[in-house]
Amino acid sequence: MALDGEYEPSPSQWVRDQVEEYESSGGTRANTLRDSGIPIVIFTTRGPRTGKIRKTPVMRVEHDGQYALVASKGGAPDNPQWYYNLVAYPDDVELQDGPEPFEVEVRQLSGDEYEQWWERAVAVFPPYAEYKTKTDRQIPVFLATRKAD
């Protein structure tokens, strides 16, 4: 079931363009980070202040049907806006990895589980390791698990 509400495209033009191209092609185009060859997925959330639907491309870090959503923001000192969407609405999230989106629930990781998924994320996208050295915050990692039908 798709999230209900008004869709508010990203203020970032490249994000808007990538989401539109990915969705319109069923994930066959715009499915890598800006021609890097590194696969992405799109996740959909609700904004906690506006209630509007937001869509965000992130690196595809998948293992056994679960996905890590890494809130790196390039190693900036603050979290990306979408971090707050996931914190506010962890059960109101969709993920698209291919032609059809599916409902997921997310939870923020800690401890050994965080370390395990962080290593997986760095293996997929090595710049994450550099991002970690650029910030004093622990870069949040959420685990997205498909909801049972």
How should each PLM-predicted stretch be described?
Residues 43, 142-146:
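Short beta-strand element of the conserved SAM-dependent methyltransferase core
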